[in-house]
Amino acid sequence: MPPTFVLASASPARKRLLEMAGISPLVAVSHFDESSLAADNTVALVEALAKAKAGTVASKFADALVLGCDSLLLVNGQTYGKPESPAVAIARWQTMRGQVGELYTGHALIDRTQNRCLCQTGLTKVHFADVDDDTIQAYVGSGEPLQCAGAFALEGKGGMLINKLDGCSSNVIGLSLPILRSLLQRLGYSLKDFW
């Protein structure tokens, strides 16, 4: 019998991705203060945040697999997380439109039964449509982008504002299923163990 699979995230999109892939996670939100960490580059930061979230939750479980994730968007040398307000989301979209961004998602999988932690980061290039100000205002007014890294949700209305992706689409939603499969296999688990 495999250990309990715990998702250390409040993200409904991550939970939905896992469920669609056949994994029914227990959700335990870390409440980790993301502003307490800094790093030299985006990859190091998303991995550190994912590991901190997973570690905070893993300390509460004796026998579990705990997955922590964190996503950030890099556009023109600027790193973006969730926008703090509608005004910030509008300004970001005015900067991002017509540009290509790099969406990084850090994954940390802690296996409490083996006392091991594996980390890996996914990168997907996002080609943003050159949308007008009215579209930006309407999109931000919908409220959808306010809880998303980079101020867009690929799986929602934001998907209409993306021209193309280079890389893993689930990574953009906040959890790369191919990376999760790889991490599970490296820890000695089969996908069917969780179906």
Swiss-Prot record:
**Lineage of producing organism:** Bacteria, Bacillati, Cyanobacteriota, Cyanophyceae, Synechococcales
Q: Keyword Hydrolase, does the record have it?
A: yes
Q: What is this protein called?
A: Nucleoside triphosphate pyrophosphatase
Cofactor(s) required, per the database record? a divalent metal cation
Catalysed reaction, written as an equation = a ribonucleoside 5'-triphosphate + H2O = a ribonucleoside 5'-phosphate + diphosphate + H(+); a 2'-deoxyribonucleoside 5'-triphosphate + H2O = a 2'-deoxyribonucleoside 5'-phosphate + diphosphate + H(+)
What are the positions of the active site?
70
Q: Which organism is it from?
A: Synechocystis sp. (strain ATCC 27184 / PCC 6803 / Kazusa)
Which EC number(s) does the record attach to this protein? 3.6.1.9
What is this protein's function per UniProt? Nucleoside triphosphate pyrophosphatase. May have a dual role in cell division arrest and in preventing the incorporation of modified nucleotides into cellular nucleic acids.
